[in-house]
Amino acid sequence: MRSIRLFHTSSTWLSKFKLDPNYKFKCGIEIHTQLKTKYKLFSLSPTSFYSTPNSKVSYFDCGLPGTQPKLNPEALYLALKLAVALDCEIQQNSSFDRKHYFYPDQPLGYQITQHYHPIAKNGFLELNSKFDEIKNSSKKINIEQIQIEQDTGKTTYDKFDKSVKVDYNRSNMPLIELVTKPDFEDLQQVRAFVKKYQTMVRHLDICTGDLETGAIRIDVNVSVNGNPRVEIKNLGSNSDIQDALKYEYTRQVDSIKNNEKIIQETRGWTGTKTVSLRLKEDAVDYRYVPDSELPFINLSPTIASDIKESLPELPEQILQKLTSKPYDLELKYARFLTENRDTLNYYFQLFKSVADRHHSGKLANNWFIHEFLGAFTKINVKVDLDILPANFLADLVLQVAEKNISTTSARLLLLQIIQTPEDKGKPIQDLIVQYDLGSPVDMSTEDLNDAVSDICSEIISNNADVVERIKKGQKNSIKFLIGLAMKETQGKVNAKTFSEKFNELLDL
């Protein structure tokens, strides 16, 4: 055992971790998801994440005698949305049960959940190598059930005065618990499933999808070579999930190698190792009984098809669309858009507006990803889609395509609009005139060519050392000359025009 402890004190073992084919990894996960409802699950208290402790608590939330629960239909609807999206079998009749245990954060003395008759069963989520970064071409993760339940209060242990404080704002918040089959065969599949699930609940506006804030909380069940499974509770980040699984798998493999018995238990993750919390409870310990104060949920036979018709395109369908014609986006950009609904809608509007008038979707892609979003990054401000409506950005892109403004001038104008609130909503053509950024339109082609020749000739004569490097084969040095020419003309003449003229004058 000493060698095991020494092994786990090293921080490098995590990066070198690898599953041993002689010791089969098997894993299932349970995901608790806070629903984005206006009110709590069984009371009219508003849901609140950042309010003053115990300021959003009804009589029922804190367990006062005589208070009764009333189901929030919005929570039911969100649970059904997720169940349909995951191809679950919706149960026409489901009910609530009481899970009894005593703890400060559970004032009722029991949790209302769906132990016997959950809202949905037998779904699945398909992973694939193209979008989910798994080794297999595809992997189907089966979902055992989805159930609705209430959250507990939040307990805080104050080390300074050794007090225990309970905030009941979270008590009775609506949750759905999703339980998978033990179908995960490696850590990549677990990571891919969690990320895909986060994207889905955000996309469907069911939950914020954040692990770090506790909106999603994950328990994992791990076993090796068919030995008793070990549960690890309340993993709060993707890195915690991966590290806890690596540690626990290695711990169990070491136990098997040393002929030590693996017991069925619940363990916690400290950040560096798993520690035993308690032996795994049998279901009878919780004394589940039907909740007599809540009626059965009776659903229409057509509820699944009705909800399916109301669902938006799911994230994987959008990824498939964005990475195919006519959009042809790189996967990393398609994934970014899929995870940001407002930005996705903006992109679709821009693409259609540009493609309809210019027949080039590539132009829209480049300007949206690299120029528009890049401009916000360049000046280190948060992206604000309202600053420049999609049809206005399309106008700017088309002005560049039609050579009414140079690319350099368009970039300058884009930065100006972002940094100048009073320019918001002004037509692009008016702004081009206002800032005198248009291409020279009062010059004939011959006069423009003569002017460009004069500028390029002067730059060549003033930069003999750069010209010498170009003639010796350092072709990229011509960009320096082009930059000087663009600066001289304040970006009004296209860089391509100067490039062609320099090549002509230098006989390249």
Swiss-Prot record:
**Where's it found, cell-wise?**
Mitochondrion
EC number(s)? 6.3.5.-
Q: Which GO terms describe its cellular component?
A: glutamyl-tRNA(Gln) amidotransferase complex; mitochondrion
**What Pfam families does the database record attribute to this sequence?**
GatB_N, GatB_Yqey
Superkingdom of the source species: Eukaryota
**A biological-process GO annotation:** mitochondrial translation
Where does this chain mainly localize?
Answer: mitochondrion
Q: Does the keyword Ligase apply?
A: yes
Keyword annotations of the record: ATP-binding, Ligase, Mitochondrion, Nucleotide-binding, Protein biosynthesis
PROSITE patterns in the record:
GATB
Q: List the disulfide bonds.
A: none
- Asked whether the keyword Protein biosynthesis is assigned, the reply is yes
Molecular function (Gene Ontology), one example = glutaminyl-tRNA synthase (glutamine-hydrolyzing) activity
Q: Which reaction does it catalyse?
A: L-glutamyl-tRNA(Gln) + L-glutamine + ATP + H2O = L-glutaminyl-tRNA(Gln) + L-glutamate + ADP + phosphate + H(+)
Please tell me what else the database record remarks about this protein.
This protein may be expected to contain an N-terminal transit peptide but none has been predicted.
- To which protein family does this belong? Belongs to the GatB/GatE family. GatB subfamily.
Partners and quaternary state?
A: Subunit of the heterotrimeric GatFAB amidotransferase (AdT) complex, composed of A, B and F subunits.
Q: What does this protein do?
A: Allows the formation of correctly charged Gln-tRNA(Gln) through the transamidation of misacylated Glu-tRNA(Gln) in the mitochondria. The reaction takes place in the presence of glutamine and ATP through an activated gamma-phospho-Glu-tRNA(Gln).
Q: What is this protein called?
A: Glutamyl-tRNA(Gln) amidotransferase subunit B, mitochondrial
Organism of origin is Scheffersomyces stipitis (strain ATCC 58785 / CBS 6054 / NBRC 10063 / NRRL Y-11545) (Yeast)
Lineage in the entry? Eukaryota, Fungi, Dikarya, Ascomycota, Saccharomycotina
Which gene name belongs to this protein?
A: PET112
